[in-house]
Regions:
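Short beta-strand-initiation
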Residues: 1, 224-226, 269
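Short, Gly/Pro- and small/polar-rich lid/capping loops
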Residues: 1-10
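Charge-rich, well-structured scaffold segments of protease-associated domains
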Residues: 7, 15-18, 62-217, 228, ...
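Active/ligand-binding-proximal structured segments within catalytic/core domains
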Residues: 11, 18-69, 143, 180, ...
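Catalytic cores of enzymes that engage adenine nucleotides and/or redox cofactors via long glycine-rich
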Residues: 219-223, 273
Length: 420
């Protein structure tokens, strides 16, 4: 499997990976136009725009878009994250030209019919309402806002209802003009694809765009704090976050390994201690997420009102204990989990295309799998313990609580427990 890269004269980047033996391909367009690229008054517009791309173009109706791909048995979708919006499809090899035409059309030529804007506005407001009614969704929005208050990285991707209710055609087209610039666009394809054919299609579709930079991005500033909402629910939910490195820092792999030891799977410390030994919860895990210039190690769990205090304190205690006595066997297991998860995931062309686009956006190149494995293997037990000790010593957290959480300790109490 060979990764090939083409840089168009206007700044659009094309990256492909042919995967021998496959009869299908995944391809799409990734745009550096996510939630953190919005101004306050635009919060939610990147996601709104993603929805509107499927509501029709100059030559296709919304039904035409869906039928074009599904008539050949394919799949088309999109997502908005804090740093990217992606439009992608999975089709059989012979249908790659069709899929590319559809995706480039919805990215470049959204119609923004005012009637369709109103219909989709209602859909998005329902999506926001559904998220608000889902505790283990909304708590992560609150945690993000608490970690990065009063800045784009801390705002929700869906946006607040008042903003979504006010967006019009001019707002959508204005955001396209700001962020859908050639320098922000990556065309990525993997599977049964021919690099030269994808390049030719990309040049034909995007070559007319005038060269333009991507625009500035406000730097992230982790501040932390507490967001507590008391509500009569069956479960008390809590999420605790520590700042970790951004994805350009090699220490991001140390953060991932520590997170895996702490709460990444059934053998992890939190799962074993909180669920298997004490029966305090059904769900508990730790995970990391990284952005260009910051990241978060997040711990989440839900439990009954009577157990929330003990579970939160146990989580902090296990984190401290891990900083003292993580073992080489645990580090080896975490390394194996990370490498196996990465390699097994990349057996899918969709995962490959996603990886190519993500790495191009970070490094403007595609580091080899071997290079990534070497970075994972380079993390020692001492590295992981020192990293964990640094988080414990700093004791700077973001804490979100939702449900019957009156007995849950406050953030200041957790800081004292970490420092003790």
């Amino acid at each position: 499997m060979t990764v090939e890269i083409h840089r168009m004269s206007n700044g659009v980047r094309v990256v492909t990976e042919h995967m021998p033996g496959l009869a299908s391909a995944s391809l799409g367009v990734w745009v550096a136009a996510g939630g953190r690229h919005e101004r306050l008054e635009q919060n939610g517009i990147a996601h709104f725009l993603e929805h509107m791309a499927f509501k029709g173009t100059a030559k296709r109706s919304a039904l035409d878009i869906a039928e074009a791909i599904e008539d050949v048995g394919g799949y088309i979708n999109a997502y908005t994250s804090r740093e990217m919006t992606a439009y992608y499809a999975r089709v059989l090899e012979n249908d790659v030209p069709l899929a590319f035409d559809v995706i480039s059309d919805i990215v470049l030529n959204p119609a923004f019919d005012p009637r369709e804007v109103e219909v989709e506005r209602h859909v998005i407001l329902q999506e926001i309402g559904q998220a608000h009614d889902t505790p283990d969704d909304v708590i992560f929005d609150w945690l993000q806002e608490t970690a990065y208050p009063d800045q784009p990285l801390g705002r929700t991707i869906l946006g607040p209802t008042d903003k979504v209710s006010s967006f019009g055609v001019s707002d959508l087209s204005g955001f396209v003009a700001e962020r859908y610039a050639p320098g922000n666009i990556i065309v990525s394809a993997a599977g049964a694809v021919d690099h030269d054919a994808i390049v030719k299609a990309a040049e034909a579709a995007f070559g007319h765009l005038a060269a333009q930079g991507g625009g500035a991005t406000d730097p992230a500033a982790f501040r932390g704090g507490e967001h507590r909402v008391e509500k009569d629910l069956e479960q008390a939910h809590f999420a605790l976050a520590f700042e970790t490195p951004g994805y350009r820092d090699p220490a991001v792999y140390t953060a991932q390994i520590f997170s895996t030891v702490l709460g990444g799977g059934m053998s992890s410390r939190l799962f074993q201690e909180a669920r298997e030994k004490r029966g305090l919860c059904y769900t508990i895990f730790a995970q990391t997420g990284a952005y260009a210039d910051s990241g978060l190690l997040t711990i989440y769990a839900g439990t009954g009102a009577d157990d929330i205090e003990g579970l939160v304190n146990l989580t902090v205690d296990e984190m401290k204990r891990a900083a003292d006595d993580m073992t080489p066997a645990e580090i080896a297991r975490a390394r194996a989990q990370m490498k196996a998860g990465m390699l097994m995931g990349l057996e899918s062309p969709s995962s490959r295309a996603e990886r190519l686009a993500r790495l191009m956006s970070i490094w403007d190149r595609v580091p080899s799998l071997e290079e990534t494995v070497e970075l994972i293997d380079a993390v020692t037990t001492g590295d992981a313990k020192a990293f964990a000790a640094g988080l414990v010593e700093k004791a700077d957290t973001a804490l979100a609580l939702y449900g019957p959480v009156s007995r849950a300790p406050e953030r200041e109490a957790l800081a004292g427990r970490l420092a003790a």
